[in-house]
Amino acid sequence: TGGKSGEKSAEIYENGKLIKTISDLSPDKEYSFDIKTENGTNTITVGEGSIWVSVADCSNQTCVHAGKISHAGQTVICAPHKLVIKIVGETSADAVI
């Protein structure tokens, strides 16, 4: 890492508070982890340069159906769990000097 052009990461927020940052969305490292809150549990998967909610115990499953996100500015929201996943980082236009 270290400021490569187009580098991106993901931030996970619960109820508006940053609770986890994923600094490597590298395609060769697929893995999953659980985010457990007082409102429920979401299983987050990282891989293929993307991040997504693979399993959630919320009622509407909108976050699961949202699919993979991989571009700066994209978000996945689980409203029942008050969880937001956001891709942050430079776009190619931002990296031009």
Q: In which residue ranges do the predicted regions lie?
A:
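Local cysteine-cluster metal-coordination motifs and their immediate loop/turn environment
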Residues: 59, 64-65, 74-82
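Glycine- and acidic-residue-biased ligand/ion/polar-headgroup-sensing regions
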Residues: 40-42, 46-56, 81
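Short extracytoplasmic
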Residues: 15-43
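Short acidic-glycine loop/turn motifs at beta-strand connectors
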Residues: 15, 47-49, 91
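Non-cytosolic head/periplasmic domains of membrane-anchored proteins
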Residues: 76-97
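N-terminal post-signal-peptidase region of extra-cytosolic proteins
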Residues: 30-33, 37, 58-67
